[in-house]
Amino acid sequence: MKRTIIMMLDSFGVGASADAASFGDVGSDTFGHIAKACAEGKADIGREGPLKLPNLARLGLGHAAMESTGAFAPGFGDNVELIGAYGHAQELSSGKDTPSGHWEMAGVPVLFEWGYFSEHQNSFPKELTDKILARAGLDGFLGNCHASGTTILEELGEEHMRSGMPIFYTSADSVFQIACHEETFGLDNLYRLCEITREELEPYNIGRVIARPFDGTGPSDFARTGNRKDYSLAPPAKTVLDKLNEAGGEVVSVGKIADIYAYCGITKKVKANGLEALFDATLAEVKSAGDNTIVFTNFVDFDSHYGHRRDVAGYAKGLEYFDARLPEMLALLGEDDLLILTADHGCDPTWQGTDHTREYVPVLAFGAGLKAGSLGRRKSFADIGQSIASHFKLEPMAYGESFL
């Protein structure tokens, strides 16, 4: 029975990529800087001591990062019995955003330029917002700027609840984000507003509209809920997910995967929020998955809760939790199963600002006859998609080189 399980640690980069200068990210290193902070006792909130990832280390994480940066991260070295194949991959795509990373690892790199709202204030064209408001029957909106999602709730959440006006904001990514209170504005109303916005953004080539529902009564307890929804453009070509689907296979999305691919190629969507629930759901789907199935999970907390919020200790604690549960996954794998652990970009929690970082991503692969050892530097995330196509004996993808 052949299956592929993709565990995507959102934002878990392993060192600045060769083109990092073009993004202002030279020196960034999500994994390395977390390990360094832990070793120096600077990440002892809710956890303590050096970063402990014994199972990821056995799969080759420390070695993959060493090949990426030229040195082992603090606490990692050669004194580990490797069981997996490891490498690190360069991104071909033009951006360091979520859709680009995901689409490329499924065999479709983004070789065009996304549209962006680059002005930090008055970010959105009036012509665009006028159309959105008219169609939605709204009198106005708040925000209209680049912002951190948590900070903008503290600043504008109460005014939003009083006025009923949605909060529009963006970032360095190709994204239009809308924050609304689940009770006072209504979740269905927020989703409908996002659908309208997605349609009106067509001429602007914006990658995603993101619904950011929140609850609470004031700045001290406003919090995003688990009902986030992404409205992505569809990939410009068929991904390996589409190809497996068309060949009669199954593609199970756990978390926000289905949204990122605009549901293209997805046969089943499983909703889960938080590292524990996402891991539980992944295990449950692997237990029930039949032949010719991909189970694909995005562990978004690493990015949204820890990377963007520059929470080093939280990121470290999350990684250690993930690592401690990996044996549960390994125990479910059959001889012909392929397990891949990777990331879609970096988001170094020690870096300036709150945005993603342009980094190599780890490619850790286990099973399907792979021998433990180095896969080297991969020229594209698309090598993952090509390897999956090879695993299932599908028609080759246009991009990428299989490591199987």
UniProtKB/Swiss-Prot annotation:
NCBIfam families: deoB, PRK05362.1. It is found in: Cytoplasm. Pfam families: Metalloenzyme. Pathway: Carbohydrate degradation; 2-deoxy-D-ribose 1-phosphate degradation; D-glyceraldehyde 3-phosphate and acetaldehyde from 2-deoxy-alpha-D-ribose 1-phosphate: step 1/2. Belongs to the phosphopentomutase family. Mn(2+) 2 binds at D303, H308, H356. It comes from Shewanella baltica (strain OS155 / ATCC BAA-1091). CDD domains: PPM (cd16009). This is Phosphopentomutase. The keyword Manganese applies. It is an enzyme of class 5 (isomerase). Transmembrane segments: none annotated. Its EC number is 5.4.2.7. Binds 2 manganese ions. GO terms for cellular component: cytosol. Keywords: Cytoplasm, Isomerase, Manganese, Metal-binding. One of its GO terms (molecular function) is manganese ion binding. PANTHER family: PHOSPHOPENTOMUTASE (PTHR21110:SF0). Its cofactor is Mn(2+).
